Amino acid sequence: MSERDSGSSGRAKAAAAVAAATPRAKTSGPAPFGAFVRKPVEKAEGKAKAQVANAGSGAAEMRMETVESWPADAVEVGAIVDAYGLKGWVKVAAHADAGHGGDALLSAKRWWLIKGQERKSAPSLQAKMHSDSVVAHLGGVTDRDVALALRGSRVYISRSEFPALGADEFYWVDLLGLDVVNVAGVNLGKVADMIDNGAHSVLRIEYPDTDKSGKPVIGERLIPFVGVFVKTVDQAAKQITVDWEADY
């Protein structure tokens, strides 16, 4: 799963709903980092418009990469699942729909790929939506056989190439690690994951706790990312304020 606040905070109001990306591989569990959630006061409009991305500057061919050359802000956004057609296009199962974070695959100039221990990158010459998948032509992928050899590759995009979001919209990856406090100022823990339960996004928060024997354990809280509970998201302060009691 992973989130950007394009404003200074994401203030929620009374009537709240959250739009979250629909993971391709699963419908619950940790959030795919390519997804985003809108501010808790606003419903998503499902703008899954087809887009085409043309490669800009840089080498036109695929190249080998190392851990050292890998971008520090690389975010996993999908996986290559098959070849598409005969001319070297690949089919990608994105972690998020276009309009819900999957646009990064359509707009990025360069894709970064991991398969096993092998790392590669290639310019995205063209990418577009096809049904519920993304299909793309990468530099150096000249025919179907080369495309088939990329099956199973995990696809990463540099966070700096993610599309800009509207006010009070957040990429999940940018919410991870933020402190969560309630309106009374009580620290509830840190965001460990985001979960999409099909109806809305859920913050999974971890905090230090003890079991019945007094042994230190990691506690967990699940707080729906909806306006009735989420009051502000302040990325500058690395803090989310919620209307949620510590003993809930």
UniProtKB/Swiss-Prot annotation:
It comes from the Bacteria. Coiled coil: none annotated. It is found in: Cytoplasm. Pfam families: PRC_RimM, RimM. Residues 1-33 are annotated as: Disordered. InterPro entries: PRC_barrel-like_sf, PRC_RimM, RimM, RimM_N, RimM_N_sf, Transl_B-barrel_sf. GO terms for molecular function: ribosome binding. GO terms for biological process: ribosomal small subunit biogenesis; rRNA processing. Keywords: Chaperone, Cytoplasm, Ribosome biogenesis, rRNA processing. One of its GO terms (cellular component) is cytoplasm. The keyword Ribosomal protein does not apply. Belongs to the RimM family. An accessory protein needed during the final step in the assembly of 30S ribosomal subunit, possibly for assembly of the head region. Essential for efficient processing of 16S rRNA. May be needed both before and after RbfA during the maturation of 16S rRNA. It has affinity for free ribosomal 30S subunits but not for 70S ribosomes. The PRC barrel domain binds ribosomal protein uS19. This is Ribosome maturation factor RimM. It comes from Paraburkholderia phytofirmans (strain DSM 17436 / LMG 22146 / PsJN) (Burkholderia phytofirmans). The gene is rimM.
